[in-house]
Each structure stands twice: as structure tokens, then as C-alpha cells.
């Protein structure tokens, strides 16, 4: 039996009234069941709750042992990059579109979450990527990503030229619109749209997926997650950027390299006991059903 939870954080950035309804339902239901509940500050303001315990994401990460994220995958990504630094488990209620990371159906969330609170769940450890934009001297600019790190032009889309080194060994040079470096978690996101492979969550692997390469021989490459990836630029005619989960942008200047590696942090994502990854793929991607 899994360890029971005692302190639960409610997280999310509500964009419409139905999401706020879910936040309020969760708060009142969990407090009625006797749990200590910390609600993210913005949600408490939106709901006009008074006399409640509120906190930032970091404070929830330090204090709670479970965070419930209400929203879509974008909300989950933003919260997860912070919560992954702490010893806290995370589960999501889907109020977005696809919801690869948010398992719970909002119409049945209370019953599904009740089962989880009784210990009827399992934990998946999802690793993050760390991207550093650095030069020979000076402090690097650092970002982390749950899904992917993307090299792309900063303003106007155009072809860029760069070299890729894996564990400091030259791998290939490329002329393309950019490069997606994806975790298994991100393999069903931007990487999939660019023709990248789907990596099951338990794989210790990273996918390198070219974006519109100017050669037919450029193909996605899957490497061990323990590898370090370095991107080098011989000359830069315009601003380039590294983006993390399409939420954090790090500009790249002349004479700077980009270093990408597996982060020391990981996300403790929990699922209901009846969760099946391949059922999720089938339903979200519209795969054909079983024939017999």
C-alpha cells in the first residue's frame, strides 16, 4: 500500500469558469475530508477565498506531499518544472485539450482522486532536460524542460546552420529550421508533430528531431539519456533562441554554445491504478481499435 497523503496542494492557472469550478470543488471536498490544503495564491484570489492557506508553487513543493494540477498539459508543464525540485507527487485533472499529462477526467475526478488518496495509484519518474547557453567565461543562462528543448530562430523563421556534438564527439552538422531535443514525455508533443518517434515514458532516452532539414538524409536520432549534447555555431547571421517547453526562452549570442543534458531533477507523476499508457496513446491520437 502506498503511503497516505496528509497535505495537498491545489495548482493551476484558471482560464475559464469551469476550471475555477473544479478548483473550488477540490478545495471544499478535500478540506471536508480533513486534509491540510494549500491553494496556489492566484487561484485563491480568483475564487475570493478568505482565511485559507495559500502559497507559491515553491512553497507548495516544500510543504505538501501531493499537488493536484487542474488544467491542460501547458499548466502541468509550468507547474512541473518547479515542483520537480521537491519531494512531492503530482497528478493532473484535465481541463485542456489532449491531456497526455493530466489523467483525471473532470467529470469523474472526485471518485478517481478518492481512490488515489486511498493509496490506489502508482508513480512514474519522468526526467527533465537542462539547457545551458554558455561561453568560455561567465555564468551560463539555464532553463529546464519536461517536454523538449528547441533550437530555433529568434524572430523570423529561416534556415540556420549548426553542429551537434554528443559526449563531445562530433555527430553531424545540419542546415534546417531548428532542432527539437525531446524527453520521452515530450515525444508525444512538438517532437511528434515534427515526425519524431514516440518513446515510452520508462525509456532512458533522448530524441533529436530535425525541423525541416535541407537534406533527405537527416533523420531523428535517439540517444541514451546519460549523453550530453552540445550545439555549436560557426557564424550567426541573426538571433537564435533555445526554448524550454515553449514557455522559457534563452537567447543565443555570438560565440556561445548550447549544452543540453539530463537534469538532476525528476517529476514524480502519479497515475490511477487502471492507467494504461497505450490506451492513452490510442484515445488521444485516434489509433484504430483492436480487431479481435
From Swiss-Prot:
Top-rank taxon, per record: Bacteria
E.C. number: 2.7.1.23
BP GO annotations: NAD metabolic process; NADP biosynthetic process
A single GO cellular-component term on record: cytoplasm
Co-factor(s): a divalent metal cation
A Pfam family recorded for this sequence: NAD_kinase_C
Cellular location(s): Cytoplasm
Keyword Transferase part of the UniProt annotation: yes
Residues annotated as the enzyme's active site: 73
SUPFAM superfamilies referenced in this protein's UniProt entry, alphabetically: NAD kinase/diacylglycerol kinase-like
Molecular function in Gene Ontology: ATP binding; metal ion binding; NAD binding; NAD+ kinase activity
Top-level class of the enzyme under EC nomenclature: transferase
Predominant place of localization: cytoplasm
Residues that, per the record, bind NAD(+): 73-74, 147-148, 158, 175, 177, 188-193, 247
Reactions accelerated catalytically: NAD(+) + ATP = ADP + NADP(+) + H(+)
Keywords from the UniProt entry: ATP-binding, Cytoplasm, Kinase, NAD, NADP, Nucleotide-binding, Transferase
Family, per entry: Belongs to the NAD kinase family.
Function: Involved in the regulation of the intracellular balance of NAD and NADP, and is a key enzyme in the biosynthesis of NADP. Catalyzes specifically the phosphorylation on 2'-hydroxyl of the adenosine moiety of NAD to yield NADP.
Alphabetical list of HAMAP family matching this protein: NAD_kinase
Protein name: NAD kinase
Native source organism of the sequence: Erwinia tasmaniensis (strain DSM 17950 / CFBP 7177 / CIP 109463 / NCPPB 4357 / Et1/99)
Amino acid at each position: 500500500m502506498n503511503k497516505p497523503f496528509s497535505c495537498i496542494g491545489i495548482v493551476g492557472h484558471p482560464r475559464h469558469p469551469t476550471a475555477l469550478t473544479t478548483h473550488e470543488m477540490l478545495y471544499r471536498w478535500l478540506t471536508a475530508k480533513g486534509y491540510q490544503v494549500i491553494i496556489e495564491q492566484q487561484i485563491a484570489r480568483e475564487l475570493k477565498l478568505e482565511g485559507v492557506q495559500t502559497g507559491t508553487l515553491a512553497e507548495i513543493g516544500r510543504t505538501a506531499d501531493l499537488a493536484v494540477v487542474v488544467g491542460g498539459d501547458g499548466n502541468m508543464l509550468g507547474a512541473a518544472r518547479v515542483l520537480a525540485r521537491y519531494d512531492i507527487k503530482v497528478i493532473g485533472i484535465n481541463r485542456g485539450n489532449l491531456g497526455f499529462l493530466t489523467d483525471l477526467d473532470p467529470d469523474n475526478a472526485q471518485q478517481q482522486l478518492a481512490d488515489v488518496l486511498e493509496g490506489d495509484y502508482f508513480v512514474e519518474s519522468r526526467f527533465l532536460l537542462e539547457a545551458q547557453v554558455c561561453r568560455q567565461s561567465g555564468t551560463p543562462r539555464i532553463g529546464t524542460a519536461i517536454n523538449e528543448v528547441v533550437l530555433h530562430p529568434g524572430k523570423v523563421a529561416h534556415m540556420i546552420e549548426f553542429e551537434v556534438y554528443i559526449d563531445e564527439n562530433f555527430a553531424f552538422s545540419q542546415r534546417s529550421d531548428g532542432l527539437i531535443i525531446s524527453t520521452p514525455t515530450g515525444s508525444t508533443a512538438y517532437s511528434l508533430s515534427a515526425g519524431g518517434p514516440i518513446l515510452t515514458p520508462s525509456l532512458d532516452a533522448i530524441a533529436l528531431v530535425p525541423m525541416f532539414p535541407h537534406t533527405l538524409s537527416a533523420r531523428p536520432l535517439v540517444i541514451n539519456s546519460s549523453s550530453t549534447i552540445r550545439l555549436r555555431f560557426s557564424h550567426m547571421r541573426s538571433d537564435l533562441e533555445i526554448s524550454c517547453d515553449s514557455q522559457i526562452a534563452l537567447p543565443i549570442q555570438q560565440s556561445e554554445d548550447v549544452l543540453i543534458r539530463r537534469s538532476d531533477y525528476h517529476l514524480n507523476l502519479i497515475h490511477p491504478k487502471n492507467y494504461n499508457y497505450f490506451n492513452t496513446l490510442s484515445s488521444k491520437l485516434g489509433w484504430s481499435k483492436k480487431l479481435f
